[in-house]
Amino acid sequence: MSDPSCELCNKILGAVVGHACGDYLGMPVEFKSKPEQVVDFFGELGIRPLTVLARGHKTAGFYTDDTAMMLCLAQSLIDKGFDTRDQFEKYKSWAFNGYMSADNKQSYGIGQNTLRKLLRQGVDNIPTKIENNNKEGGNGALMRCLPIGIVYFQEIDQVVEKSVLSALVTHNNDIAVWSTVVFNTFVSYSLKGLNKDAFLDRFFAEHFYRDLPEDIKTLLQKLQVRNEQDISNTGYSLNTLEIALVSFFSTDQLDDAIKMAIGFAGDTDTQGAVTGGLAGAYYGYNSIPNNWVESLQNREMIINIAQNLCAISSKKN
């Protein structure tokens, strides 16, 4: 493993592994619609012994589409640099052959919009501009976008450009696309070592802030005074982004942030993954409970991918 004492490596490992742990911890209670149902399973937002965190024939530590697609994007960046055609092909390989999946056999949890795009769009028809298809506002682009924020973290214009183009591979919707920009910008701030209390003011001053959809601007402007009871737990990108940011800003350590995100119920694996990725980038690998890491399926492969992302990011920056 890369030396976790190296601050940048520690943060990148934290982001990738935190994402995967948040995913598998949320998996057993995905689609429970009420927070009290999550509490019934986990117990007051604690995490039960990991051996019981299973769902059907999926064992503890089994991650879903959130992490598998994130790993596909990461490996594409490692293999080809930024290449949306290769990203598309790796997503197809996951969807139909189980590439990067937890059991290395088949995909799990693929969204209908993503499946439709992989079946019908074709690698030669990937859009490069937002056309705002209202049917493509799900969180499938947000859940996988983390590696962009890692690789390009020092170049904010590249974070924006690459986040947009990578999201458009499957999601041609302004909120779905710009949610990835917000998330990856905060990942960038985390890897740069900024204090999270300064994130929002820094973001409001970014030149691209004016381009954001109004719904995202409203979310960010109200973030620090948001009533948790008003937050929706649907699988749409805006709601998932809000849950992740509220959970991140309202807590002081990674495990509490992930538990809070899962505690909102709904699309819990994605909420846990997105929150875990950001919190991991901020607090680092050493902040993840050891038993969470030890239970993660394909742990060595995931850590190796994170190491390779660290190597690429270090060279770029």
Where are the model-predicted features located?
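Structured, active/binding-site neighborhoods that engage oxygen-rich ligands
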Residues: 1-317
